[in-house]
């Protein structure tokens, strides 16, 4: 199982969407672009996701669902799949982490962990 998990590399890029945010209403919109790279020897299909989002007040929310952005992509060996999505937070800083549930061509299911990453409005972190 560990070998399967290590065959998937996940890269994240985040952006603060200032023009759609409203700090006076405690509404901070962030986008995140995820690149999922299959370093393994067989294709894998992303079946579902689980996100845990913790804002600066310590409030935690979980988001689970099938696929990503309406797709359940199959990622062939040595290729990547990329998508962009977004989330709204009540604070200008939050941390997201989670995992993707993946299935190999042989039908073996495993979780590909997504390491914690920051969502931050500019000017908050030094």
Curated annotation (Swiss-Prot):
The gene is apaG. This is Protein ApaG. It comes from Shewanella loihica (strain ATCC BAA-1088 / PV-4). Residues 2-126 form the ApaG domain. PANTHER family: OS05G0170800 PROTEIN. NCBIfam families: PRK05461.1.
């Amino acid at each position: 199982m560990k070998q399967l998990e290590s065959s998937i590399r996940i890269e994240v890029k985040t952006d603060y969407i200032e023009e759609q945010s409203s700090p006076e209403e405690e509404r901070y919109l962030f986008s995140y672009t995820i690149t999922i790279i299959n370093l393994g020897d067989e294709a894998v299909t992303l079946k579902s996701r689980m996100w845990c989002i913790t804002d600066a007040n310590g409030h935690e929310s979980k988001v689970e669902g099938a696929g990503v952005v309406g797709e359940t992509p199959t990622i062939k060996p040595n290729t990547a799949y990329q998508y962009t999505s977004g989330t709204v937070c009540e604070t200008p800083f939050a941390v997201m982490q989670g995992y993707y549930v993946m299935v190999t061509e042989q039908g073996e299911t495993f979780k590909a962990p997504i390491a914690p990453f920051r969502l931050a409005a500019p000017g908050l972190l030094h």
